[in-house]
Amino acid sequence: MDQPRRWAVEVVPGADRDRLCPLPRHDVVPSRSIPPTALAIAQAIRRVRTSARCGAAEHRDLFADPAWDMLLDLYVAEATGRRVSVSDACIAAAVPQATALRWLNMLDQRGLVIRTADQTDRRRWWMTLSDAGVALVERMLPPTMT
C-alpha cells in the first residue's frame, strides 16, 4: 500500500494564492531512465518558468505556453518517479482548468502523452509522456555536455 503523501505550502511571491506542493518522496522508483544532466536542465527550466510567471508583467508572455509547462512537468515527474494525475497536469499548466484540459487533449491527440485509468479510483486518470513526448522534450532542451 502506498504511504500517505506529505504536502507543504509553497509561497509564491506575487501570486494570487499559495500552492500546496507534494514534498519529495524517497521511496519512488523512476519509470524511465533519463540522463541526470537532462533532468537537471528540465528542472531548472521549470523553476525559471514558474518564477518568471510571478515576475515582471512585461515579460510574462514569454513564459505563457501551458503545453510546454505540462510536458516539462511530466518529464521531470517520470524521471523522479512521481505519478501525475490529470488534475496535477492542469495545475502545472498554471491556466484555468478548462484551458489546461484542452491542451491535454491536444497533446493526447498528437500522441505526446498517454492517459491511463486509475485502477482504484475510476474518477482519476494518470498522465505519462509517450516515447514521442519524451523525444520532443529532449529535443527542446539545450544540448548537454557529457
What are these regions (language model features)?
Residues A89, A100, L104-R110:
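Basic amphipathic alpha-helical segments that dock to polyanions
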Residues A42-L72:
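Short alpha-helical segments that sit at the start of domains
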Residues M1-R32:
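DNA-contacting interfaces and partner/effector-binding or oligomerization modules
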Residues D73-A77:
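Short amphipathic alpha-helical elements of helix-turn-helix/winged-helix folds
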Residues D108-D118:
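A short, conserved structural fragment
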